[in-house]
């Protein structure tokens, strides 16, 4: 046996290992082999087996023979502790029941088995021989091990089982493989990193950081206590975060990304379908909530959700606290706190697109923009509390679905459309039910009948085909209209143009202001004009001679003034002169008649001639 110099530090290590081991009562003896170069083994049953420049200190400390043909022994290996093995060149193992496997590997720590054992079943053993390969084969036993080129294992029961693997922490595991007898075959986990008690990084380039964190996919990363990344390129960050889809990302406590390419960001956020993006606390992608009406159910593929407690179906977008995209359509977008979309676009706090009377069960192509706006069935609502196809309560919540609203448009605060193909524009402008194709424009305007038009502040058109244009006009007669400031038309087929007019007659027309027309079929022209029923004039007697007039049975009259407020009728064309003519006669025609009358009669006698006009006296004497 060759002599070898034992430094004070080496003696301290030897003494410490001896005193801390189960064999503290056994004297420590150091030896060198006769065939090795500067190798040293100290302790009961320790052995360097011909290793070169190697050191084995402790009970059952073991450096095996070289397994490469032509190689003398393991070079520059160090094994310190009870039941330890350094089986690779330049490897280092420190602790009880620890193992290093390949070149440059490091294992520091020990197992947690109670009692004193000698076993070749202590975890993973590369090549045991001689006295080190006998005794009990234990079950449920885990040794500290660094098996792989450049592997590093630090901590009790820590294991680094592949090339470049790093495990730090009690029972941490980096890499995986299979054991055939006393030979370990690494299958995965190259360059893997596991840091934290009971953490595990089992696939190539995987990283697990945190207590019981788990990275089991290639290039996967799990950071946080109980975090898990279980698919290739998955990332889970946060306590109990879970990323199980390929390329999925889960960030936040209890977050989960189960779909491929899914993103869940926020505490308890979940993206459970492929391509889903959910951002915010408790954000979730959901199945089609209206699948019961025949739409295909799905699990939120390509859904996007951003905000606390958001919900998004497949292809939907939900952004904002409590926002929800219910239907799996590309046009399903809900943006804003509490926004809800069942197939269209809802933007604004509490904005919603909901199913109305549409048999398909969706509100596809609907748009709702503004706080508490509501749209049902292919409508458009713009403005706070604007609504189409559904009425609202006083506090702005949906009340009931109306009989109409398809293709309706409401623009303005509190505007509403409750009939098909109708339009309401302005604050509190409304088109009520049973008023298809109606129009209401202006503050407090209202159209409540088919094809009705109300334009102006407070304008109201309440009968079919009516027109009310101007402030405060009220038109309730079918096919009637009013243009101007507050006028009222209740007659059928009647029109008022002007201000402050009242027409209760049917088929009547007023052009002027402050006119009250109650005469059917009449026409009133001018400010403050009045009208009364027409009086028939069948004929007239002159000097006892009766004359009958044409047009002696009028159905109504035209008024252009009032008593004391008469008006001339100017620029009247010459009317026809005949026994049956009903044309108006202008001044020139009357002038022609009077001119002839004023010429008088020419009389001739034996004494001469003379002229007498109508009404003049002519005296005739006998000769």
Question: What are these model-derived regions, one by one?
Answer:
Residues 1-623:
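Primarily extracellular Gram-negative trimeric autotransporter adhesin
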């Amino acid at each position: 046996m060759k002599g070898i110099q034992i430094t004070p530090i080496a003696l301290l290590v030897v003494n410490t290992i001896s005193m801390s081991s189960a064999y503290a009562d056994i004297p420590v003896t150091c030896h060198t082999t006769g065939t090795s170069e500067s190798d040293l083994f100290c302790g009961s049953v320790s052995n360097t087996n011909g290793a070169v420049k190697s050191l084995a200190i402790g009970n059952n400390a073991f450096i095996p023979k070289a397994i490469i043909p032509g190689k003398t022994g393991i070079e520059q290996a160090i094994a310190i502790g009870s039941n330890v093995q350094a089986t690779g060149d330049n490897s280092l193992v420190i602790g009880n029941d620890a193992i290093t496997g390949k070149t440059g590997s490091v294992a520091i720590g020990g197992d947690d088995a109670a009692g004193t054992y000698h076993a070749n079943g202590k975890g993973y053993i590369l090549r045991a021989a001689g006295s080190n390969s006998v005794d009990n084969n234990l079950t449920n036993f885990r040794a500290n091990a660094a098996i792989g080129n450049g592997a590093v294992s630090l901590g009790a029961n820590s294991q680094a089982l592949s090339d470049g693997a790093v495990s730090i922490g009690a029972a941490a595991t980096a890499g995986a493989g299979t054991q055939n007898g006393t030979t370990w075959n690494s299958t995965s986990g190259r360059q893997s990193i596991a840091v934290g008690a009971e953490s595990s990084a089992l696939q190539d380039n995987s990283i697990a950081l945190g207590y019981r964190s788990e990275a089991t996919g290639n290039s996967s990363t799990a950071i946080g206590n109980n975090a898990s990344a279980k698919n290739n390129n998955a990332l889970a960050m946060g306590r109990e975060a879970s990323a199980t889809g390929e390329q999925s990302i889960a960030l936040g406590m209890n977050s989960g990304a189960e779909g491929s390419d899914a993103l869940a960001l926020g505490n308890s956020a979940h993206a459970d379908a492929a391509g889903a993006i959910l951002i915010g606390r408790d954000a979730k992608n959901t199945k089609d909530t209206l699948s019961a009406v025949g739409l295909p159910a799905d699990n939120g593929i390509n859904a996007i959700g951003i905000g606390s407690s958001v919900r998004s179906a497949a292809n939907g977008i939900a952004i904002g606290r409590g926002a929800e995209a219910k239907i799996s359509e590309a046009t399903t977008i809900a943006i804003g706190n509490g926004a809800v979309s069942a197939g269209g676009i809802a933007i604004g706090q509490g904005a919603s697109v909901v199913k109305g009377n549409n048999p398909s069960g969706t509100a596809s192509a609907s748009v709702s923009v503004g706080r508490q706006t509501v749209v049902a069935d292919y409508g458009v609502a713009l403005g706070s509390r604007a609504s189409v196809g559904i009425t609202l309560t006083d506090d702005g919540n949906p009340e009931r679905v109306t009989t109409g609203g398809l293709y309706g448009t409401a623009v303005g605060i509190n505007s509403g459309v409750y009939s098909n193909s109708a339009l309401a524009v302005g604050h509190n402008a409304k088109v009520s039910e049973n008023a298809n194709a109606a129009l209401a424009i202006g503050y407090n305007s209202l159209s409540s009948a088919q094809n009705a038009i109300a334009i102006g502040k407070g304008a109201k058109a309440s009968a079919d085909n009516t027109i009310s244009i101007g402030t405060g006009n009220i038109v309730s007669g079918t096919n009637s209209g009013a243009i101007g400031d507050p006028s009222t038309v209740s007659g059928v087929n009647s029109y008022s143009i002007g201000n402050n007019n009242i027409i209760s007659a049917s088929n009547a027309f007023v052009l002027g202001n402050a006119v009250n027309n109650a005469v059917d079929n009449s026409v009133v022209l001018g400010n403050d004009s009045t009208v009364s029923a027409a009086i028939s004039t069948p004929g007239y007697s002159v000097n006892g001679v009766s004359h009958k007039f044409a047009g002696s049975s009028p159905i109504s009259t035209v008024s252009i003034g009032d008593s004391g407020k008469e008006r001339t009728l100017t620029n009247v064309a010459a009317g026809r002169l005949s026994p049956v003519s009903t044309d108006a006669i202008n001044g020139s025609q009357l002038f022609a008649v009077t001119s002839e009358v004023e010429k008088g009669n020419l009389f001739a006698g034996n004494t001469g001639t003379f002229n007498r006009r109508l009404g003049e006296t002519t005296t005739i004497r006998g000769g």
